[in-house]
Regions:
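Bacterial N-terminal signal peptides
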Residues: 11-22
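Coiled-coil-like amphipathic alpha-helices with heptad-repeat character
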Residues: 1-2, 19, 36, 41
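Boundary at the C-terminal end of the N-terminal hydrophobic targeting segment
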Residues: 25-30
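Mid-chain, structured segments of secreted extracytoplasmic proteins
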Residues: 86-135
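Non-cytosolic coordination micro-motifs
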Residues: 31-91, 130-231
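Bacterial N-terminal signal peptides that target proteins for export
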Residues: 2-13
Length: 231
């Protein structure tokens, strides 16, 4: 049994190494079959146009947000505080930036695979300002996803960068500290920023293991934040 476990762990490490290599060498179009984060193929089959996610785009009024296709509305700062629809955004307290954060998901009746963005299970948060304008969007890979899906979470960052154009990103890569170790010889702690089309975009990718985590446990995630900028 010990040998079987060791083989399983070795296989997992090898897969992670291959995924990292693929992310570095694969053309952007191949990384993201839908062509963008909000495109037809990656967001439940809806026509996106210039939208940021499905039929949602920054700058639209919260009153124009469609309820159809979305469920599980709740205040991001207090998920126990549920909402019946987008119109309840005022019930969520504003943060220091004066944004009301609403967490939501895709309706399984129209999205059989659940809340999936570009092939990744995701946690979605919409930011509405005091004037009722959609001013931000956060997409985080779901840490509760099954291992065989979660191990690819760091690749979502590459897909986001492809969606908003590969040029013009400013990226920093941190070095491992005493509490972080590479996974299969690979360490990713990257933060990239870009401003384009009245949007400020931040993409954070992490892939590492903490000393107290076993061989099958590690941090593997992407967080994306898009904020509306002034014209």
């Amino acid at each position: 049994m010990m040998r079987r476990a060791q083989r399983s762990i070795a296989t997992l490490v090898a897969i992670l190494s291959l995924l990292v290599t693929a992310a570095r060498t694969m053309p952007a179009a191949a990384q993201d079959p839908g062509g963008n984060v909000a495109g037809d193929k990656v967001s439940g089959g809806k026509n996106s146009g210039d939208n940021d996610l499905r039929d949602i785009h920054l700058g639209m009024s919260a009153t124009d947000l469609p309820d159809a296709g979305y469920v599980n509305f709740a205040c991001a700062t207090d998920p126990q505080k549920t909402l019946t629809a987008w119109t309840g955004w005022r019930d969520c307290p504003a943060d220091p930036s004066r944004f009301h954060a609403i967490q939501f998901g895709y309706d399984p009746a129209t999205s059989r695979e659940g809340t999936i963005v570009a092939g990744h299970p995701a946690i979605l948060t919409l930011l509405v300002d005091d004037a009722g304008i959609v001013s931000g969007l956060r997409i985080e890979t779901d840490p509760k996803a099954r291992l065989y899906i979660r191990k690819k979470a760091f690749l979502f960052g590459s897909q986001v960068k492809s969606r908003y154009g590969l040029d013009g990103w400013s990226c920093t890569q941190a070095q491992p500290n005493a509490g972080e170790q590479p996974v299969g010889g690979v360490y990713v702690r990257e933060r990239c920023t870009k401003t384009t089309d009245n949007r400020s975009i931040v993409v954070e990718r992490n892939l590492f293991r903490k000393p107290d985590q076993d061989m099958k446990s590690f941090v593997d995630e992407t967080r994306m934040t898009i904020l509306r900028t002034k014209d």
